[in-house]
């Protein structure tokens, strides 16, 4: 686990008088920094402290914010996505100094992407320590649960997403019925002997790109492990989430941000656009690596 994240978590335990917070941090440390909590643990902790799932998620926000990386804004945002399964998926904002602001990962994007890669089928609630910005409201409007997603803040609970985004423009306006978190039945018939290349291609098959059809996936060699990310497109285009950010986010929230990345593989289908250039830019500026690119 990243030393900075570990120090922040230790500080929470040492300085907080909140026994719930201490229990959550203890569980995260026991998991070697993996920033997600199973539905069984959520239920047991809620029962022990007589808290609803949303009340518990609100108490988790300082823990989620420990995963933020904000060298530009110095403004740490934490989020907790509550899955239909009942599991919690933490998220936090991540900025990349020296690169374009468009490369930034927003906390809500982080939590949503975390849940998506972990195999969650839908989200019921988004809990965040600051009001979602317009970018994130539009991003969450792409979810298969957007019509019923509840937003909870420390000062305001039980608000539907669409109360923050009235008269919203989204996938339905473009006749898209299979949306983010729905199964994406793509198949390229691509096979490769290199497991990391195959992992990138497999990630691209699960990407969501109904507008451009430019499906893309990234695979990172992180020590002995591989971490993948996939593209999540948005009807408004600019809030789309890129595959390298998706993979880096999952690496950080899996407690592996201190393990060096030695290879980056990108696999992409031909569509109305390409993310090769912007991915190469971040790979070079943030990781000092060149990507290995494969056209599908």
Curated annotation (Swiss-Prot):
The molecular function terms of the Gene Ontology recorded here are: cytidine deaminase activity; identical protein binding; zinc ion binding
Q: Which gene encodes it?
A: cdd
Q: Which InterPro entries match?
A: APOBEC/CMP_deaminase_Zn-bd, CMP_dCMP_dom, Cyd/dCyd_deaminase_Zn-bd, Cyt/Deoxycyt_deaminase, Cytidine_deaminase-like, Cytidine_deaminase_bacteria
Please give one Pfam family short name: dCMP_cyt_deam_1
The UniProt subunit note reads as follows: Homodimer.
Keywords for this protein = Hydrolase, Metal-binding, Zinc
Write out the GO cellular component annotations. Answer: cytosol
Catalytic site residues? Answer: 108 (proton donor)
Its UniProt entry gives the catalysed reaction(s) as: cytidine + H2O + H(+) = uridine + NH4(+); 2'-deoxycytidine + H2O + H(+) = 2'-deoxyuridine + NH4(+)
Cofactor-binding details, from the entry: Binds 1 zinc ion.
The similarity annotation says: Belongs to the cytidine and deoxycytidylate deaminase family.
Q: Which residues bind Zn(2+)?
A: 106, 133, 136
Q: What does this protein do?
A: This enzyme scavenges exogenous and endogenous cytidine and 2'-deoxycytidine for UMP synthesis.
Write the Enzyme Commission number(s) for this entry: 3.5.4.5
Q: Quick one: which residues bind substrate?
A: 93-95
Record-level GO BP terms: cytidine deamination
Tell me which residues make up the CMP/dCMP-type deaminase domain. Answer: 52-172, 191-296
Cofactors named for this entry: Zn(2+)
Respond yes or no to whether keyword Metal-binding is given for this record.
yes
Per its record, how is this protein called by name?
Cytidine deaminase
């Amino acid at each position: 686990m990243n030393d900075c994240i570990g120090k922040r978590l230790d500080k929470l335990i040492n300085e907080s008088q909140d026994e719930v917070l201490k229990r959550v941090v203890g569980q995260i440390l026991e998991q070697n920094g993996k920033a997600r909590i199973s539905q069984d643990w959520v239920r047991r902790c809620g029962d022990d402290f007589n808290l609803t799932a949303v009340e518990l998620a609100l108490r988790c926000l300082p823990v989620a914010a420990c995963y933020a990386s904000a060298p530009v804004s110095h403004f740490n945002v934490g989020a907790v996505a509550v899955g239909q399964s009942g599991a919690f998926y933490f998220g936090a904002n991540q900025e990349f100094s020296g690169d374009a602001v468009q490369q930034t990962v927003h906390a809500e994007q982080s939590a949503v992407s975390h849940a998506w890669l972990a195999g969650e089928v839908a989200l019921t609630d988004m809990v965040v320590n600051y009001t979602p910005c317009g970018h994130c409201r539009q991003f969450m409007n792409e979810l298969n649960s957007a019509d019923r997603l509840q937003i909870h803040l420390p000062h305001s609970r039980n608000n539907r997403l669409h109360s923050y985004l009235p008269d919203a423009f989204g996938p339905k306006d473009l006749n898209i019925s299979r949306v983010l978190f729905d199964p994406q039945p793509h198949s390229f018939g691509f096979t490769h002997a290199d497991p990391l290349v195959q992992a990138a291609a497999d990630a691209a098959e699960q990407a969501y790109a109904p507008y451009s059809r430019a499906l893309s996936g990234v695979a990172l060699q992180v020590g002995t492990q591989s971490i993948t990310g996939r593209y999540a497109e948005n009807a408004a285009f600019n809030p789309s989430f890129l595959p390298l950010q998706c993979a880096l986010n999952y690496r950080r929230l899996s407690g592996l941000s201190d393990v060096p990345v030695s290879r980056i593989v990108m696999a992409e289908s031909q569509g109305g656009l390409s993310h090769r250039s912007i991915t190469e830019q971040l790979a070079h500026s943030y990781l000092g690596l060149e990507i290995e690119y494969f056209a599908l």
